Amino acid sequence: MSFLRKMLLLCSTVCSLFIFAVSASAMSFSADIYSSDGQNGKIYMDSGKVRMETSEMISITRPDKMLVWLLMPETKMYLEQALNPADPKNKPMPSNESAPGEIDRVFILKETVNGYASDKYKVTINDQGSHYEWISSDPGITMSVKTAAIDSSWWNEYRNISLVTPDPALFEIPPGYVKMSMPGMSGMAY
């Protein structure tokens, strides 16, 4: 697989995980992320800043700087992309608000997900169809703890949630990393 294809695949994975994370953006926390596709990782969030780690790449989203950094630890290099403020998925929202494009949210039942008392909803988004979302109702953890396809073909969930504020250094480019550019990607914005 070419380097560019690999980068685009990783960017796609990180973006899909970011959509899952945005509902908890008002909180400071860290958690393990588990996905049905095996792209497991770690998320750190504080004041709208998001760091997502997978086995291949680290993504740091900085709304305050309107940037996304994609770090490749293996090569100590990073890509920098503009964060598009007009894109609705980049706007932080508490979990009790509608998702971008959401047209319906129906309460299904109360159940426990990974030890968190949660309310299960069927959420319909205009161009993406419907999925299930579990919102924790535990005090202090008002966030989406799991999302899943109606047909169970995919799912993402947070486990081992810690409400400790992450180290601010996690939201910066580590020392020793070199900025790289990729032709054709300079105008892309998330």
Model-derived regions: residue spans:
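Sequence-pattern detector for short linear motifs
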Residues: 8-9, 123, 182
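Non-transmembrane domains of secretory- and envelope-associated proteins
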Residues: 101-104, 109-119, 127-132, 137-190
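N-terminal secretory signal peptides that target proteins for export/translocation
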Residues: 1-5
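N-terminal cleavable signal peptides for secretion/export
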Residues: 22-42, 89-98, 103, 180-182, ...
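N-terminal mature ectodomain segment of secretory-pathway/periplasmic proteins
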Residues: 24-74, 107-112, 117-120, 124-132, ...
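Bacterial N-terminal signal peptides
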Residues: 10-20
